C-alpha cells in the first residue's frame, strides 16, 4: 500500500516537472490533465524521459534533506532567526524607492508575429518558430492547444497536429528589433535590452520633461495608405469624438473600424491636407506614465505592425510581472505607493516571479509556500533552510522590492556561444562545428574589444549528460585560430577518453573568460623597443616637469624614478642641469624659482637611490671608466660613477692637473712636475694631438664629441692663432692599413646614406655625453669606438713605444716629456718621447679624430 502511494506521488511529481507550465500568457483555462497525458505518452521511454527521471530523483533527495534539517530546528533558533530577518526587513523598508517609473516592454509572440506579418496566410493558423527538436515560440492560436516555447517540436505536433513549424530567420528578427529599439531610445537613451523582444526603460526624466510639452508635440497622425511620416506638426484635419481621442486606434480590439489603419503614423503639411485622397486621423497622448506607455506601444505598432505589451511599476521586478498581466497587446500599472505594491504582491503566485523556476517552486511547495504572502510568513524558516543569497531574494520578493538601476552589474565576466543539434558522432563533423563556434565567438569578442585567457567547451551527449572542460593560457587571446587551437585539444581529449566508442553529442558550446584588464597589460614583459620608448618618455617628462613649480607636479617624475635605469636617471639630471643653466642666462630671477625645485628633485632622487642601496661590500666595474672597484659598497660605487659622469662638465681642469701629477708619480718622480697646461695649450693638445694616458683618463678629456672630428682643420687654425708656440701636430696611429682605409671608405659614402635626426639630441649610452651631431652614422661610429676603446688603447700603447721622435727646442722638449710621462704605462722607465707627425691637411675623418 505504501509502495503504491509512493509511486503515485512520484508520478505526480514527474508530471509537475515534465507537464505543461501554464504560467504564460494565452494558456489560461486549458485542460492540463489531457495535455500532460499526451506529453507523457510522447516522451516515455526516450532519453529525455530518463534524464528527467534522474533529475526528479535528485530534487526529491534535496527536499528530503531539507525536511530533515527542518525537523532539527529548535524554537529558540527560530526566534533568533525571526529577529535577524525582521531587522533586515526593516532596513529594506527604510531604503524602499518609489520615485522611479520603470517600464518593461515585451513584444507579443515576437518571432511568430514577424513571420505572420511577412506571410499573411499564417495569420489565422497555429504556427511555431523552431524545429522538430525545439521550438523558440508559438503564436496565440497554437497556445490554445498547449504548444509553447522550449517544447520539442514532435511533442507539439502531438498536441496540435495542424501546427505549422516555421524555421527561424534571426537576421529578420534583428532588423525588426532595431526598429523597436530606435523608438525606445527616444524615451530613455539608457534603456536596457534583455533580448530581441524585451527591454526595460526608466521614463522618470521623460515624464518630468513631458509636463511642459504642448499638445502638438504629443500628437500622432494616422494615415490611410502607404505614405511616409513628415515631421512638421499641424492641427488635426477632422474633428474626433472624445472617445476616439482617448484610445489608441491600433492597440485595442474594440477600436472603431474606421480607425483601423493600413499605413504608418505621420504628421501632415498643408499641401497634403488639401489632398482629398488622404484619409487621416490623429491621436493626442497625455502626460502621465500610462499615456507615455500607450504612446510607445502605438508607435511600435505603427512602425512595425507588431503589438507589444508593457508593465509600469516602481522597480524592474514588478514591471516584469505587470507586462504579463494583460498580454497580448495590453498594459498594466502599479501606482508608486507601498500599499499598492503590497496589494499586488499579496496573492501573486511565486512562480510568476522571474527567478523562481520549477525546482525552487517544488521545494517551496514542500514547505507549504505558494503565494508571496506565505513567502513572507515563513521568512524566518527560509533563512535557516536556504542560503543567504536565496532567502534575501525571497524577502525582496515578499516585500515587492526590486532594482531601479538599469545598469548592468559590474563588468562582463565571460562570453559564449553554443548550439543544439541532432546527434553528431563523427569526429570530423565535431571539429568542424567547434571551428564554426570559435569563429563566431571570436567575432563577438572583437566587436566588444575583449581578450581572454580561459577557453571552456561545453558538451552534452545524447544521454543529456553535460561536461565542461577548460584550459587557461598565459597570454590573452581573441582570434578564431587561437581559440580553436585550444578548444580542439579539449575536444580531442574527450574523444580519446571514450575511445573506441564514438562521442555522441547533441549540444556543443565554447566560452571565453578571464578577460584581461588594464592592470594585467601593465605587467607584461618589456621589449627592447618599449625600453627605448620609456627612456625617451622619461627625458620629455623630466623637461616638462621642470616648467612647473607645483610640488605635486614635481613629485610625479620621482614616482617613476625607481622604474628607470641608472643611466636614464643620470641623463635626466644632466639635461635638467643644462636647462637650469640656460634659464639662468635668459630669465634671471624667474630661473631661480625653477632652479630650486630641480635641485630638490635631484636631491630627492639621490636619496631615493641611496635608500635602496645595500651596504654589502662587493666588486664592481664602473660602466664609465671600466675600472674595477674592489671591496666597496653599492653606495660608494654609485658615488664613483657620479663623479665619472659629472667629471667632464664640472671639474675638468682639476682632473687634468690631477692626472698630470699622478702620471709623474708613476715614473718614480724622476722628472720634474710641470704646472698644468694653460687653456690655450690644452686646446692645442686636444685638437692637434691625443695625450695617451691610462684607459680611465680617456674619459677625462673635454671634447669627445663628433664636432671636433668633423672640424679638425678649423680647430687647428684656431689653436695656432691663440697659441703660436704650439706646433701643428698629430698623434701617430700605427694601426693596420685596412682599418684606416675602412674608415675612409665609410666616411666617403656617408653623405649619400646618412640619416639625420632633427629636433632631438643624441646622447652616447656609453660615455653619457651629448653629441653635437644629427648624423646617425657618425653617432654609431662614436658609440662603437666608446665600446672598443680598451682594445684601441692597447694597440695605441703598443705601437706608440716603437716610434722615436727627434729632440726639439728646450720648451717644446719639456712639454713633450710631460706628455710622454703621461703616455707611459705604470712600470715603464724609458724617458724617450715619441715623435709626432704633422697632421695632414686632408679633411677626412680619422680614428684619432673620432676618438676625441
UniProtKB/Swiss-Prot annotation:
<dbReference type="GO" id="GO:0042276">
    <property type="term" value="P:error-prone translesion synthesis"/>
</dbReference>
<feature type="compositionally biased region" description="Polar residues">
    <location>
        <begin position="261"/>
        <end position="273"/>
    </location>
</feature>
<dbReference type="InterPro" id="IPR043502">
    <property type="entry name" value="DNA/RNA_pol_sf"/>
</dbReference>
<dbReference type="GO" id="GO:0006281">
    <property type="term" value="P:DNA repair"/>
</dbReference>
<dbReference type="GO" id="GO:0060090">
    <property type="term" value="F:molecular adaptor activity"/>
</dbReference>
<feature type="compositionally biased region" description="Basic and acidic residues">
    <location>
        <begin position="840"/>
        <end position="852"/>
    </location>
</feature>
<keyword id="KW-0808">Transferase</keyword>
<feature type="binding site">
    <location>
        <position position="786"/>
    </location>
    <ligand>
        <name>Zn(2+) 2</name>
    </ligand>
</feature>
<keyword id="KW-0227">DNA damage</keyword>
<keyword id="KW-0235">DNA replication</keyword>
<dbReference type="GO" id="GO:0005634">
    <property type="term" value="C:nucleus"/>
</dbReference>
<dbReference type="GO" id="GO:0090734">
    <property type="term" value="C:site of DNA damage"/>
</dbReference>
<dbReference type="GO" id="GO:0006260">
    <property type="term" value="P:DNA replication"/>
</dbReference>
<dbReference type="InterPro" id="IPR043128">
    <property type="entry name" value="Rev_trsase/Diguanyl_cyclase"/>
</dbReference>
<keyword id="KW-0677">Repeat</keyword>
<keyword id="KW-0862">Zinc</keyword>
<dbReference type="GO" id="GO:0034644">
    <property type="term" value="P:cellular response to UV"/>
</dbReference>
<dbReference type="InterPro" id="IPR017961">
    <property type="entry name" value="DNA_pol_Y-fam_little_finger"/>
</dbReference>
<feature type="region of interest" description="Disordered">
    <location>
        <begin position="252"/>
        <end position="273"/>
    </location>
</feature>
<dbReference type="Pfam" id="PF00817">
    <property type="entry name" value="IMS"/>
</dbReference>
<dbReference type="GO" id="GO:0003684">
    <property type="term" value="F:damaged DNA binding"/>
</dbReference>
<keyword id="KW-0460">Magnesium</keyword>
<dbReference type="InterPro" id="IPR006642">
    <property type="entry name" value="Rad18_UBZ4"/>
</dbReference>
<dbReference type="Pfam" id="PF11799">
    <property type="entry name" value="IMS_C"/>
</dbReference>
<feature type="binding site">
    <location>
        <position position="625"/>
    </location>
    <ligand>
        <name>Zn(2+) 1</name>
    </ligand>
</feature>
<dbReference type="InterPro" id="IPR022880">
    <property type="entry name" value="DNApol_IV"/>
</dbReference>
<keyword id="KW-0237">DNA synthesis</keyword>
<dbReference type="GO" id="GO:0008270">
    <property type="term" value="F:zinc ion binding"/>
</dbReference>
<comment type="function">
    <text>DNA polymerase specifically involved in DNA repair. Plays an important role in translesion synthesis, where the normal high-fidelity DNA polymerases cannot proceed and DNA synthesis stalls. Depending on the context, it inserts the correct base, but causes frequent base transitions, transversions and frameshifts. Lacks 3'-5' proofreading exonuclease activity. Forms a Schiff base with 5'-deoxyribose phosphate at abasic sites, but does not have lyase activity.</text>
</comment>
<keyword id="KW-0704">Schiff base</keyword>
<keyword id="KW-0239">DNA-directed DNA polymerase</keyword>
<keyword id="KW-0539">Nucleus</keyword>
<dbReference type="InterPro" id="IPR036775">
    <property type="entry name" value="DNA_pol_Y-fam_lit_finger_sf"/>
</dbReference>
<feature type="binding site">
    <location>
        <position position="640"/>
    </location>
    <ligand>
        <name>Zn(2+) 1</name>
    </ligand>
</feature>
<feature type="zinc finger region" description="UBZ4-type 2">
    <location>
        <begin position="761"/>
        <end position="791"/>
    </location>
</feature>
<protein>
    <recommendedName>
        <fullName>DNA polymerase kappa</fullName>
        <ecNumber>2.7.7.7</ecNumber>
    </recommendedName>
</protein>
<keyword id="KW-0479">Metal-binding</keyword>
<keyword id="KW-0863">Zinc-finger</keyword>
<feature type="compositionally biased region" description="Basic and acidic residues">
    <location>
        <begin position="805"/>
        <end position="817"/>
    </location>
</feature>
<dbReference type="GO" id="GO:0003887">
    <property type="term" value="F:DNA-directed DNA polymerase activity"/>
</dbReference>
<dbReference type="InterPro" id="IPR001126">
    <property type="entry name" value="UmuC"/>
</dbReference>
<feature type="compositionally biased region" description="Basic residues">
    <location>
        <begin position="821"/>
        <end position="839"/>
    </location>
</feature>
